[in-house]
Amino acid sequence: VTGPAPLKFAGVNIAGFDYDALVQAXLNXGYLDSDNSGTLAINTETGGGNTASXVE
């Protein structure tokens, strides 16, 4: 069984993307492809908090 098609992440196709991490980013208040462009941009955490935000 093959996995899902690679996601286009920040303009780069990445095979075997960690979908659990993607879902967690969303749960942390991030957005998943908010304009349906097919490209996701997830910002890593900055500052001293425990939550990473994600915005396209």
Curated annotation (Swiss-Prot):
It catalyses: Endohydrolysis of (1->4)-beta-D-glucosidic linkages in cellulose, lichenin and cereal beta-D-glucans. The active site is at E45 (nucleophile). Keywords: Carbohydrate metabolism, Cellulose degradation, Glycosidase, Hydrolase, Polysaccharide degradation, Secreted. GO terms for biological process: cellulose catabolic process. It is an enzyme of class 3 (hydrolase). GO terms for cellular component: extracellular region. Its main location: secreted. It comes from the Eukaryota. The keyword Secreted applies. It is found in: Secreted, Extracellular space. Coiled coil: none annotated. One of its GO terms (molecular function) is cellulase activity. The keyword Disulfide bond does not apply. Its EC number is 3.2.1.4. Has avicelase and carboxymethylcellulase activity. Belongs to the glycosyl hydrolase 5 (cellulase A) family. This is Endoglucanase Cel5A. It comes from Gloeophyllum trabeum. The lineage of its organism: Eukaryota, Fungi, Dikarya, Basidiomycota, Agaricomycotina.
